[in-house]
């Protein structure tokens, strides 16, 4: 069963809203090292979205998603420092994963996400792993949440 990692989902939602991610962390960490105080920091997307109430529902049959693997060579000579300069790359991905993501609209950030997805607007185009595996995001609507006892 392939589970959609919550932090990965927050990263995708943060990309839609234009929040900074892990690439900003290198700058933050190097600045803190220079100042002599290294404390824990999180990317902007996580700081802003960590409190969202989210449900992730797998839609593939029994939650099983097939995995594809591709192996290719990069033999330009400078790709690898090993003798011969041949870099063997093994890439793997999930084939046609499907999840239904439910977000409780109880805060401003959740409402921003709803508006962005509903209006097909995003700051950074979301993708799953590599930029040739774009996320196909559909807005399904708003439903009333009910408490179950």
Protein language model annotation of sequence segments:
Residues 18-23, 41-45:
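Compact, well-ordered interaction domains used in eukaryotic information-processing assemblies
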Residues 38-42, 46-149:
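Internal, well-folded beta-alpha domain core
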Residues 21-26, 110:
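Short, solvent-exposed secondary-structure capping/transition elements
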Residues 3, 29-30, 49:
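Domain-level signal for Mg2+-assisted phosphodiester chemistry and nucleotide/NA-binding surfaces
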Residues 27-41:
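Intrinsically disordered, low-complexity domain-flanking/linker segments in eukaryotic proteins
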Residues 1-22:
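N-terminal ordered "arm"
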């Amino acid at each position: 069963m392939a589970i959609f990692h919550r932090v990965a989902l927050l990263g995708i939602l943060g990309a839609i809203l234009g929040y900074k991610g892990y690439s900003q962390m290198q700058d933050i960490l190097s600045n803190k090292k220079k100042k002599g105080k290294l404390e824990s920091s999180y990317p902007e997307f996580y700081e802003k979205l960590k409190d969202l109430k989210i449900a992730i529902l797998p839609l593939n049959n029994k939650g099983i998603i097939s995995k594809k693997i591709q192996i290719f060579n990069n033999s330009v000579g400078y790709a690898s420092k090993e003798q011969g300069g041949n870099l063997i790359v093994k890439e793997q991905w999930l084939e046609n994963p499907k999840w239904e993501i439910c977000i409780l609209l109880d805060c401003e950030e959740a409402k921003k996400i709803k508006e962005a997805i509903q209006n097909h607007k995003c700051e950074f185009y979301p993708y799953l792993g590599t930029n040739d595996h774009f996320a196909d995001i559909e807005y399904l609507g708003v439903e009333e949440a009910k408490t179950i006892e």
